[in-house]
Every structure is written in structure tokens, then in C-alpha cells.
Amino acid sequence: MALRRPMVAGNWKMNGSAQLAQELFKKFATKLQDDSAEVVLCPPSIYLESVRQLLDENKEALNGCLVRMGAQNLSQHDFGAYTGEISGQMLKDSGCRYVIIGHSERRRMYGETSVIVAEKFAAAQKHGLTPILCVGESGPAREARRTFEVIAEELDVVIEKNGTMAFDNAIIAYEPLWAVGTGKSATPEQAQEVHAFIRKRLSEVSPFIGENIRILYGGSVTPSNAADLFAQPDVDGGLIGGVSLNATEFLSLCTIAMSA
């Protein structure tokens, strides 16, 4: 059985400030216990430099704990007349190691198709970033028992563009759309069922990838439900939204992941 290091990735979305970043670090930087879990902070792009500086300033306090920086999005293009966009190389230069790809809010609000998501996945890896690929079904799709079909389609487009071995350097985040930002989480059993499906599907093409890829759960994760979610055999941590803005609660999630 593969030893997959748990991950807790905090997606600030369009929230936060440089001051908030400082307050978060003051509260949790010295309290992280060890390197048994990886913590990723994904602030708005304008604050990447602030977070990078805080990581450098708190390196001694972090004492070897694995705290990385990630971005919330990137362009599928390397450069050009794409006003407001940020390329993979720019994110790499900013100190990012990870980037969220295909978040449900990007797909829904900005019309990002699975083809665009696959292109962004490729752009991330081209520039040495590890994509955190988000997949998930809507409420109506779940009610129609199409969860596996929807997720398979989203995975297959990325595989067709990039190949299965591209997932050797990737993270998958299952985020049921009906649970994102709603306060309604999937049950541990529901999450495990979908995570197991994702792992099995990748294993059919590459047993190594299937066994070793980390699959996060994203959808109203809180300190009260995290232990049961993270205890599932195919759940390797969480992609956290609003709770990542609360230092006390985010630290609690990190601590739970470290003991999972």
C-alpha cells in the first residue's frame, strides 16, 4: 500500500489581505507539529509575494514543516495579449509550487470547459507547477445517478490531452458542486465512494498512478467533520475554502490531517 502524505490546501478565493496573511502566520506558523502532512496556501495572486515573504521570514519557526504556496488559476497561454491573465512561468517566478485547475467556480462562472481545463493542466506542468485538478458533479447529476459518468468525462479529457502519466505529478480534488460553499458536506461514505472510483479509474491505465496519486476532498470541510473524512482510505486530505481564512480552524484541519 502506498504511503501518501496527506495534504491540506487552503483556497482563499477572492478574500484576504496582506494583513490577514500576517495574522494567519502569527497564529499557526509556530504551532504546526511536523512534516507528516503538507500544507498549501493559495491566496489571491496579488498576495503571492506577501505570502512568499512570510514563508521565508518564518522558515525557522516552521521548523521543517511542509508549507508551500499555490495559485488559484493560470492561463493556458504562455504569453501574449491576454489582459488580466497570469502565465505558469509568472506563477513559478512568484514561488508557487501548486496551482488549482478547473475549480467549479471557474467552470461555472467563467465558462471554463473541460478542454480549457486540460490545456491549463498542460500549461501548469510545462512550467514546473503541480496542478490540483478539481472534478465533481452537480446536485442534479448526483440525483440522476450520473456522478461517476460526469467525473469520468472530466478526467478523460485531461488524459486525452496529457496522457495518464501526467498524473504522476498532479493532485486531484473531488469537489461535489452541491457541497461547495453550501455548508452541506458529502458524508464520509459518499466521499470515499467517489475517491475510490477515481483511484480505480486511473489504476486501470496505470496501477502506479492509481495507487500513489493524492485525492483531496473539497466541499464544506470543517474541524467537526474532517477527522471522519480524512480517515477514509482513499481521502488524502482536503481542498479548503472559507475555513482556510480562520487561522484557528485551519490549524485544526492541518493537525487532523497530520494524525490521519
Swiss-Prot record:
Its main location: cytoplasm. Substrate binds at N11, W12, K13, G181, S220, G241, G242. Pathway: Carbohydrate biosynthesis; gluconeogenesis; Carbohydrate degradation; glycolysis; D-glyceraldehyde 3-phosphate from glycerone phosphate: step 1/1. GO terms for cellular component: cytosol. It catalyses: D-glyceraldehyde 3-phosphate = dihydroxyacetone phosphate. Its EC number is 5.3.1.1. It is an enzyme of class 5 (isomerase). The active site is at H103 (electrophile), E175 (proton acceptor). GO terms for molecular function: triose-phosphate isomerase activity. Homodimer. Involved in the gluconeogenesis. Catalyzes stereospecifically the conversion of dihydroxyacetone phosphate (DHAP) to D-glyceraldehyde-3-phosphate (G3P). PANTHER family: TRIOSEPHOSPHATE ISOMERASE (PTHR21139:SF42). This is Triosephosphate isomerase. It comes from Shewanella halifaxensis (strain HAW-EB4). The lineage of its organism: Bacteria, Pseudomonadati, Pseudomonadota, Gammaproteobacteria, Alteromonadales. The gene is tpiA.
